[in-house]
Structures are given as C-alpha cells and as structure tokens.
C-alpha cells in the first residue's frame, strides 16, 4: 500500500502501487510475461522457487533468463535441475543494503559494479541488455566470463565477516580492531583458499596473504560501518543464508578432503 522506494546512495526512486503488478499466485500471471527472472529471495527458498518456476514455465518467454542475485556459491544448482545451463546465470553484488521499512531499500555501501555471468561457462553476452538497464537505474552493472572468481571473492569477504559480526553484534570494521576476531577471520580465509586450491575453482588472488592485504587495507575500511545481511536477518528473526556461505565451504571441504573444522 506504500509503494516501493530506493533511497541512500545514488538516485532515489519511488513507485506507487499502480505502477507495478504484484501476483499472489503463479496462476494469475499471463503466459510469456517475463524476459528475465531475478531470484532475490533468501537462498533457503531456492528449492521451492525453482520447482514452482518449472511447474509454471508458460509464464516465461522462450528466451527467458534466470539470474540469481544472492549471497553464497553454487546457488544455481537447484535451478539447473529444471532449466538448461544457458538459461541460469548468477550475479555478484557487492553493494550494501538495509531495509528500514518493509517497502524501502536503502543503499548504504557501494564498492564495485554488479557482475552477471554463468557458473556453467555459458556465454554471458545475452545479459548485456539487462546489464545496461540496471546501469541506467544508477547502479553500474557489467557482464563477465569469470563470475566464479568474483563469487569466490565475495565468499571470502562474507564468510570471514558475516558470522562474527552476528556473534559479536558489531559492524564489519569493529571486527578488525580485536586480535581474537582477526585471528578467527584469518583462519577462515586460510580455509577457503585451501578449499579453492583443491577444487576446480579459482579466485582473483594467488594466496591467502595476498587477499588479506586487500581485505584489511581496503575492503573492510570501505564498509567499516556496515552491518551484514546475516546480522539483519537475525535482528528480524528470519532464517539466514549461512548454509550457502560458510556451509558451502564446509561441504566442499568434506568433498575435497580439506580440514575446515
């Protein structure tokens, strides 16, 4: 009833309820409605969303692309049960948001452009149009053939910061001011690099030490006052995405024989 608003950094937008459609049931959506479907839910809903989209494929246009805007890694797997590799893509978002009210999204931190690509080596050129549309809204967006590297870069960042920020009830920056929390974050970073090296994946840095230099000199200072999405979930008493963050590292550690205990 209050519409939708985007505030904070960049251009502000507001939309009244008569400027968009909300569907309460898939059956209410006309056939061939969507060129793109953005998956912006918490990752715990992916099994249900992927299944229901598959059951209602008639609402998707023939060349519809599903783009997953979520924390974590391998979030495309539930959708690949029902859709082909050239229909499912992932986004790397390293922009901070908060939701002061249910209808307001506030951009609190911006570090790098949104990146769109495929974890299955599909050509991302088909996403150029939607990347341009997102950029036109005020948040820069680009495509990449190396989305896996960038998603692992975000995993390094989120897995080191999010759980501790919740447990210690503090911002990202405060975590770097205590030697005990720094030691824990350093250990998490080491574990993730060990998993990456044993797996078929790669990231943007050659070693944990190389990443740590950037982490403490730029990445955390740039987001010093930010509270993680995991922290916000706990405050709202809703399920977190920890299973697709640190939980993914644990599962891959077990798969590749890396001690992440």
Q: What residue ranges belong to the model's regions?
A:
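Glycine-rich phosphate-binding loop and adjoining beta1-alpha1-beta2 segment
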Residues: 1-15
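A general structural signal for well-ordered alpha-helical segments in protein cores
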Residues: 34, 46, 75-76, 127, ...
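NAD(P)-dependent Rossmann-like dehydrogenase/reductase catalytic/cofactor-binding core
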Residues: 135-136, 186-261
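Short, hinge-like loop/turn segments at secondary-structure boundaries
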Residues: 5-9, 84-85, 105-109, 159-161
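Helix-loop-beta segment of a Rossmann-like dinucleotide-binding subdomain
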Residues: 35, 57-60, 104-115, 166-177, ...
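Rossmann-fold dinucleotide-binding core
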Residues: 32, 69-150, 154
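Active-site-proximal catalytic alpha-helix in oxidoreductases
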Residues: 148-176, 180-193, 220
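Rossmann-like NAD(P)(H) cofactor-binding subdomain of soluble oxidoreductases
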Residues: 13-104
């Amino acid at each position: 009833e209050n519409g939708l608003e985007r505030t904070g950094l960049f251009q502000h937008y507001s939309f009244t309820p008569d400027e968009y459609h909300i569907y309460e049931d898939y059956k209410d959506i006309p056939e061939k409605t969507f060129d793109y479907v953005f998956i912006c839910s918490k990752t715990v809903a992916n099994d249900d969303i992927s299944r229901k989209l598959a059951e209602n494929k008639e609402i998707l246009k023939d060349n519809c692309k599903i783009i997953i805007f979520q924390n974590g890694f391998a979030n495309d797997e539930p959708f690949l049960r029902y859709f082909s590799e050239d229909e499912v893509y992932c986004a790397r978002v390293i922009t901070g948001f908060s939701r002061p009210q249910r209808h307001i999204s506030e951009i609190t931190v911006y570090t790098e452009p949104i990146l769109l690509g495929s974890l299955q080596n599909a050509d991302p050129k088909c996403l150029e149009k939607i990347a341009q549309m997102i950029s036109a809204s005020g948040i820069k967006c680009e495509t990449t053939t190396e989305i896996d590297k960038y998603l692992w870069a975000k995993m390094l960042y989120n897995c080191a910061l999010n759980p501790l920020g919740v447990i210690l009830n503090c911002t990202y920056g405060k975590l770097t001011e205590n030697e005990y929390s720094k030691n824990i974050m350093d250990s998490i970073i080491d574990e993730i690099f060990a998993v990456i090296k044993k797996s078929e994946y790669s990231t943007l840095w050659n070693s944990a030490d190389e990443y740590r230099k950037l982490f403490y000199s730029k990445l955390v200072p740039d987001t010093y006052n930010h509270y993680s999405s995991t922290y916000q979930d706990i405050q709202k008493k809703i399920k977190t995405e920890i299973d697709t963050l640190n939980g993914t590292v644990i599962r891959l550690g077990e798969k590749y024989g890396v001690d992440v205990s």
